[in-house]
Amino acid sequence: MPVGRSLSLDPNLLAQLQSHSPTLWLNPHQGMPLPDFAPTAADLADADARLRRCAGLLAELFAELRPSGGLIASPLQPAEPLKRAARAGHAQAGAWYVKRDDVLPVAGSIKARGGFHEVLALAESIAERHGLAGADTDRRALASGAARARFARHTVMVGSTGNLGLSIGMLASALGFRTVVHMSADAKAWKKARLRTRGVEVVEHAGDYAKAVDAGRRQAAGMPCCHFVDDEGSRMLFLGYATAAAELAAQLAQAGRPVDARHPLFVHLPCGVGGAPGGIVYGLKALYGEHVHAFVAEPTASPCVLVQLAGDAAHPRSVYDIGLDNRTEADGLAVAQASPLAAALLRAQAAGAFTVDDRQLFAHLLDARERLGIDLEPSAAAAFGGPAWIAGSDAGRAYLRGRGIDPDAATHVIWATGGSLVPAQEHRRFQAHARAQRQVGGAGA
């Protein structure tokens, strides 16, 4: 049987994916009922409340967070220069913004949202269980000597391609937990080095993301007092990401950009295993319902969420099942199989997915530098082609027509997910590669 034949994928879509051709896929399942295990409004409120009551603790632990009072928040940057430079004429419609999670302090990526939330939830639980904190206790007590001594008896473990490991590792080690990060072959050397300087134990694996996660999960299962942060199924991570929705809503209101039937919001999100975009989409849908249209961006070598959403929902699928190799410069997105939790929720809520090849990643990275003054890592540039896909492709225009959307009234938010902690020499290497690529032929949108 040919590779991919048993996945219930449309033959034309399968051929496009197997040829590594950048593709826009529209989700026919959008609007279906949410699964029974979907988070509740109370779950979302609890996550937001946790990050707020722990803000003072975070500000005490990390000087970088003191200007925000310990709140995990990033700016919303207008992207008109990027819009003007878009090559497809229709792609210039609406208002464009970049959500700058690339500059989130301490972790330097979107993973601060989910990772910090999970570690804080664990720390609160342990502290309350041992009488070190109560419901009304100032959470700065979690940085006390007594709390650190208690946390030191516990291990926090995670499997990662890099950025989630940084997020978990930085906070867990700062609180006094023994911290172990299993890192895949895709993880960058500087990320491993940064963790080790904080006393984090880094376990390197020759295999991909899934193998690193599985190794961590198996090790944690045999250890007492060990908490495994499961990027493939953690509700705490998911809810931490979802808190970004209220932050974005406040920023859009301040910018005078309403979100309603006449003024839809399009959000374009880089996607690896699916937890971060899934959580953000879930939070935005809770606020805006059908007026938000979310598209996830994946490498052509690693479209694990697209494969899962477009295929049979009942069976987990991998990009290896359709003959792809999961090899991409977008190390943070090099994931072969989607999170079952995130995929089930995105199936009901995502508008679609698009893929981007490595040449496009570097072209977008250079556009971000030259047009907006933003230095990104390659995976963080994955979603920059989103507005052009929507307004400049046949499928995108059909999506707009089918919903009676006026492109000029839309707001597009492109999520930039990481880059501020990348060493300067790495940024220079990325940009030199992108400029050399441009000289020998450039890349599409």
UniProtKB/Swiss-Prot annotation:
Q: How would you classify this enzyme at the top EC level?
A: lyase
Q: Which UniProt keywords apply?
A: Lyase, Pyridoxal phosphate
Q: So what EC number does this one have?
A: 4.3.1.18
| Names of required cofactors | pyridoxal 5'-phosphate
A GO biological-process term: D-serine catabolic process
N6-(pyridoxal phosphate)lysine: residues carrying this PTM = K111
Recall the GO molecular function terms of this protein's record.
D-serine ammonia-lyase activity; hydro-lyase activity; pyridoxal phosphate binding
Which Gene3D superfamilies has this protein been placed in?
3.40.50.1100
Q: Which PANTHER family match?
A: D-SERINE DEHYDRATASE (PTHR48078:SF9), THREONINE DEHYDRATASE, MITOCHONDRIAL-RELATED (PTHR48078)
The text of the family note is:
Belongs to the serine/threonine dehydratase family. DsdA subfamily.
Name of the protein in its database record: Probable D-serine dehydratase
Organism of origin: Burkholderia pseudomallei (strain 1106a)
